[in-house]
Amino acid sequence: MLVLDSGAVSRLAERSRASAALVLALRDEGLWPAVVPSVVLVECLQGHAGRDATANQLLKTCDVVDQIPVGLARRAALLRRRARRGSAVDAIVVAIAEPGGTVLTTDPDDLEALAAYSQRVVIERI
């Protein structure tokens, strides 16, 4: 499973050849559509249709997870406590990638700290 954080959504939504090539490569590897927890949208959208247009186009190709079950929220809280860093959104991103998933990000520091306490989650920088 491939999970995107807000930085990855923003980067992949850029109108660049590199971003388009990466999405195509992920699709070819069977890793697309990516999973995006809905709480990530709070960090990568601005609430303006024009400014959010490219991100919204990308999100239409992803599996956006609307509901965060209580068990997943508790797991994210445990990851935050153990790592002693990271936002609630970052912790949910890592928890949803368990077990054995990959998180794509532009800022791996807090995510790597959380993943150190996860079940085999890998953090990849784009």
Language-model-detected regions and their locations in the chain:
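Short, well-structured N-terminal submotif of metal-dependent ribonuclease cores
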Residues: M1-V35, L45-D63, E124-I126
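Alpha-helix capping/helix-boundary segments
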Residues: A8-V9, V40, L72, I92-V93, ...
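Short beta-strand scaffold positions
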Residues: V36, Q67, A88, T105-T106
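Phosphate- and divalent-cation-binding pockets in alpha/beta enzyme and binding domains
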Residues: E43-C44, R75, A113-L114
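Acidic, metal-associated active-site segment
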Residues: C44, S87-T102
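Short glycine/proline-enriched coil/turn segments at helix->beta-strand junctions
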Residues: A49-A53, R81-R84, A97-T102
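Acidic catalytic patch
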Residues: T61-R82
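Acidic, PIN/NYN-like endoribonuclease modules and their adjacent C-terminal/linker elements
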Residues: E98-I126
